[in-house]
Design a protein with these regions (language model features):
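Hydrophobic alpha-helical transmembrane segments of membrane transport/permease proteins
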Residues: 15-66, 85, 156-175
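An internal, D/E-rich "acidic patch" concept
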Residues: 58-114
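Alpha-helical transmembrane segments of integral membrane proteins
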Residues: 2-3, 89-128, 144, 157, ...
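Membrane-water interface segments at the C-terminal ends of transmembrane alpha-helices
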Residues: 23-29, 59, 70, 134-163, ...
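Membrane-embedded alpha-helical segments of multi-pass transporters/permeases
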Residues: 16, 20, 24-29, 145, ...
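Hydrophobic alpha-helical segments of integral membrane proteins
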Residues: 9, 47, 51, 61-77, ...
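N-terminal signal-anchor/signal peptide hydrophobic helix marking the start
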Residues: 6-17
Length: 306
């Protein structure tokens, strides 16, 4: 296992370096002067000169990259031009809220999706199976923003059960988490069903039944345990996508997470904030994928020797 971990860590190093290079180039690949793009052409010369010195835009490219790497190495992602605060501080305040939303969406998707998949496999062609199939088609077909608007219209405007937007207690979390997790619920239900059908027809399950074990024990301890191995990968990738791709959900529900922070930075041309956010979110996604690989190897020892 230690060798597998070492290999995965070594593979993550060039990926993180590539992320660092892309994040650095974001500030300079845009057409025109990045300083004028942020503050406009009407700014006074003193402000323009100060910002150019802070961003080192007049230095040679290798020197700028070396300076950028040295700052990132100590956790300095720069300073937001709009909030006039360190970008790392802005991220520290907003990322826990995104993590809360992603965790709630993952919990909801896991419980509902896996449960529907198991019940569908236990009774193929039944009512639950047809319901799960229809839910899967709807969940995969509808875009996130459309699902969010439908949920707001139904539960906030029509029924008035839940608030339409904002950040607060559990009531504010339900609709964003359901919106973010709907696609995963649909996909997990179909994947769990397929994996469970294969497991229930396997030789080890027939052996367990021949020994007189009850169907509940056969399903949960034998079939489900093996069927969840491919599901782990999907859960890990979805969780990484929740953390890094919740921009639409946070915008629709006015959730004060890092996704909304990125939208505000883009709309106001805050290039250092965009650069720092992209670097942070990309690193988070790489780390989550690494943890997913380790969890998959733990669940299926065959992966370690491939």
């Amino acid at each position: 296992m230690s060798g597998f971990i070492a290999r995965r860590l070594l593979l993550a190093v060039p990926t993180l370096f590539g992320v660092l290079v892309v994040a650095f180039l974001l500030l300079y690949v845009a057409p025109g002067d990045p300083v004028e793009a942020m503050i406009g052409e009407r700014a006074d010369s003193a402000t323009i000169a100060r910002l150019r010195a802070e961003l080192h835009v007049d230095d040679p490219l290798p020197q700028r990259f070396a300076h950028y790497v040295s700052r990132v190495a100590v956790g300095d992602l720069g300073r937001s031009y709009i909030t006039d605060r360190p970008i790392a501080q802005d991220i520290r305040e907003r990322f826990p809220k995104t993590l809360q939303l992603a965790g709630a969406a993952m919990l909801l998707a896991s419980c509902v999706g896996i449960t529907l998949g198991v019940l569908s496999a236990r009774h193929p062609g039944g009512l639950v199976d047809r319901f799960a199939l229809g839910l899967a088609y709807l969940g995969i077909s509808f875009p996130v923003y459309y699902v969010g608007l439908l949920l707001i219209l139904l539960f906030a405007v029509t029924l008035k059960w839940l608030p339409p937007s904002g950040y607060g207690g559990l009531r504010f979390l339900v609709l964003p988490a359901l919106t973010l997790g709907m696609r995963s619920i649909a996909f997990l239900a179909r994947m769990t069903r397929s994996a469970m059908l294969d497991a229930l027809n396997a030789d080890f399950v027939r052996t367990a039944r021949a020994k007189g074990l009850g169907e509940w024990i056969v399903t949960t301890r034998h079939a489900l345990r093996n069927a969840l191995i491919p599901v782990i990968t999907v859960l890990g990738l979805d969780f990484g996508a929740y953390l890094t791709g919740s921009i639409l959900t946070e915008t629709i529900f006015s959730w004060p997470g890092i996704g909304r922070y990125v939208v505000n930075a883009i709309s106001r041309r805050d290039l250092p904030a965009i650069q720092g956010s992209v670097l942070f979110l990309s690193t988070v996604f790489v780390v989550v994928n690494l943890i997913t690989d380790l969890a998959y190897a733990k669940a299926d020892p065959r992966v370690r020797f491939q």
